Amino acid sequence: MMLNDVRPAIGAKKRKKRVGCGESSGHGKTSGRGHKGQKARAGGSIRIGFEGGQMPLIRRIPKRGFNNKLFHVFYAPVNLSALQGIQQEVIDESLLRQIGVVKGKWDGIKILGKGEITQAYTFKVHAVSASAKEKIEKAGGKIELIKSTP
């Protein structure tokens, strides 16, 4: 068997439906749209959910619930283990982005307590977990919380 002998299985390649190309094609004259009416016209389709002027189901059913997702603040999580070996005394967002610990778009930085810290750092961040705060203060470091601006 040669490569030029290979053919697709029967029925695997469906022919494109060519409309308006003669009566014998089966899709001539009205091109499968029927006779007249809104759906036969160009651009003539009703919007989704339209029920002919009757009050649509989506508007008949009452609204329920709410969410505050719009107001949620997404912090970039930074563990203490990721900060081992940093030479600078002050750790802020610009430094964390520069060394590649924080990437992407976030509303702020949150320091988490996974890992240990030995050097005394000054953190200028938006939030700190309780375990991280304890470990930072134990190592002699300070935390300056920044108010996040939406």
Curated annotation (Swiss-Prot):
SUPFAM superfamilies, per the entry: Ribosomal proteins L15p and L18e
Top-level taxon of the source organism: Bacteria
GO cellular component term, pick one: cytosolic large ribosomal subunit
Protein's GO biological process: translation
Pfam short name (any one): Ribosomal_L27A
Region (Disordered): 12-43
Coiled-coil positions: none
GO molecular function, a single term: structural constituent of ribosome
Record field: compositional bias (Basic residues): 30-39
Keywords in alphabetical order: Ribonucleoprotein, Ribosomal protein, RNA-binding, rRNA-binding
HAMAP family linked to this entry: Ribosomal_uL15
PANTHER family the UniProt entry points to: 50S RIBOSOMAL PROTEIN L15, LARGE RIBOSOMAL SUBUNIT PROTEIN UL15M
Binding partners and assembly: Part of the 50S ribosomal subunit.
Function noted in UniProt: Binds to the 23S rRNA.
Family: Belongs to the universal ribosomal protein uL15 family.
Protein name: Large ribosomal subunit protein uL15
The gene coding this protein: rplO
